[in-house]
Amino acid sequence: MEILDVYDIKGNKLDKTTVRGNLQLKEGEEFIKIVTVWFRSGIRYLIQLVSKQKGSEYAVTGGHVPTGSTSREQAKVECREELGFDLDDDKLKFIGSVVETRVIIDVYLYEDEDIDLEEVEFNLQEEEVESVVWLTKDEMEDMILKGILRDSTAHQYMVYIKDM
């Protein structure tokens, strides 16, 4: 059972928690936090194919922020768990938040020009991630048009990544 802190629309933590899978939130007033991490090396971004159990869709790395954790801390946890990749804190940059139905998504950019796209190896968590692919912005926009990029990932792309 995963316990999550509850936040107001501005991202301020309220004196309340809820249980993942059984969210008890006042619509439009209370939210949980999710974190996502966009990896960029040169002109390419890392997108993962989420496992079949999780919906078989393309998305960025991320997850729920549990009680007592910050989104920055959880960004590191999610990357370690899902990709087997330890983030260098100096290269992890908060770029903003997106508010969606019942969630506030804290969006981070991990930029590392030294990643060799042909050589980097990820140790994927099979329950979460089927595979990963490095894409250009044009390739992501094509996926958005085809409807094969998770809606929240497409939303983050349009708000923060497209014009970078």
Question: What would you call each of these model-derived segments?
Answer:
Residues 1-36:
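Acidic, metal-coordinating catalytic segment for phosphate/diphosphate chemistry
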Residues 10, 41-44, 51, 111-116, ...:
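Short loop segments at secondary-structure junctions
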Residues 17-18, 49, 98:
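Short hydrophobic alpha-helix segments
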Residues 22-25, 54-58, 152:
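A short local loop/turn or secondary-structure capping micro-motif enriched for an aromatic residue
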Residues 32-64:
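A glycine-rich, hydrophobic loop/mini-helix early in the fold
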Residues 63-149:
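Unchanged
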Residues 150-164:
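Charged phosphate-binding loop/patch that engages nucleotide di/tri-phosphates or the phosphate backbone
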